[in-house]
Amino acid sequence: MQDNALTIALSKGRIFEETLPLLAAAGIAPTEEPEKSRKLIIGTNHENIRLVIVRATDVPTYVRYGAADFGIAGKDVLIEHGGTGLYRPLDLEIAKCRMMVAVRKGFDYEAASQPGCRLKIATKYPEIAASHFAGKGVHVDIIKLYGSMELAPLVGLSDAIVDLVSTGNTLKANGLEAVEHIVDISSYLVVNKAALKTKYALLEPIIQSFGGAVKAKWAFI
């Protein structure tokens, strides 16, 4: 990467949409909408700043290895896949949700999750799930899925799921209920440590702008 250029790693969807006001606070505007473009590299109103659109789980990897100078990553991704080797200066307080355990309505989770019991857990967060239940002394068989998590308890694939919950509407629509909170999730600014040194003059104003925008947002709530 050039010393006078910045590459920002972002994922499509909610994180991108909620990052736009932060980018605007730093005077950065994408030239295209990722949801409407097939391009994976998108320019901005600054010739030396570009966005790379990657999977949410890949953002820390792009930043850690220097393919991007900084990015926005969910706490769930940082916990599950590791945030080592990254500078994490800000909790941006965006894309907020909760990591929860959910079961079919009527399932006696309290009795089934006593120390020494065994549960089948479907999730795309095996590390988080395993750590949580190990802390409770519960034995688990982890079944890794990549989507439609709510289906697993309904067809007998699992006793419970571990997944992100925002409104809870999807759980309710499928006859499930959240029964245990694991961790609150939001998205963080993650910065490549080498870039922070070599591109400090470019990065620091953006970090400060992001921080100011986060504080201003909560000042009005």
Curated annotation (Swiss-Prot):
Write the record's keywords in alphabetical order, separated by commas: Amino-acid biosynthesis, ATP-binding, Cytoplasm, Glycosyltransferase, Histidine biosynthesis, Nucleotide-binding, Transferase
Intracellular or extracellular location(s): Cytoplasm
Under catalytic activity, the entry for this protein gives:
1-(5-phospho-beta-D-ribosyl)-ATP + diphosphate = 5-phospho-alpha-D-ribose 1-diphosphate + ATP
What would you give as a GO molecular function for this chain, any one? ATP binding
Stated EC number for the protein is 2.4.2.17
* Pathway as given in its UniProt record: Amino-acid biosynthesis; L-histidine biosynthesis; L-histidine from 5-phospho-alpha-D-ribose 1-diphosphate: step 1/9
Query: Which Pfam family, an example, fits this chain?
Result: HisG
Quick one: signal sequence residues? none
One Gene Ontology cellular component term attached to this UniProt record is: cytoplasm
Against SUPFAM superfamilies, the record matches this protein to: Periplasmic binding protein-like II
* Enzyme kind, highest EC tier: transferase
The record ties this protein, via CDD domains, to: PBP2_HisGs
Q: Name one GO biological process term.
A: L-histidine biosynthetic process
InterPro entries in UniProt? ATP_PRibTrfase_cat, ATP_PRibTrfase_CS, ATP_PRibTrfase_HisG, ATP_PRibTrfase_HisG_short
**HAMAP family registered for this protein in UniProt:** HisG_Short
Family under the similarity heading: Belongs to the ATP phosphoribosyltransferase family. Short subfamily.
Q: How does it assemble?
A: Heteromultimer composed of HisG and HisZ subunits.
What the protein does? Answer: Catalyzes the condensation of ATP and 5-phosphoribose 1-diphosphate to form N'-(5'-phosphoribosyl)-ATP (PR-ATP). Has a crucial role in the pathway because the rate of histidine biosynthesis seems to be controlled primarily by regulation of HisG enzymatic activity.
What does the entry's free-text domain comment contain?
A: Lacks the C-terminal regulatory region which is replaced by HisZ.
Name the chain's protein.
Answer: ATP phosphoribosyltransferase
Q: Which organism is it from?
A: Neisseria gonorrhoeae (strain ATCC 700825 / FA 1090)
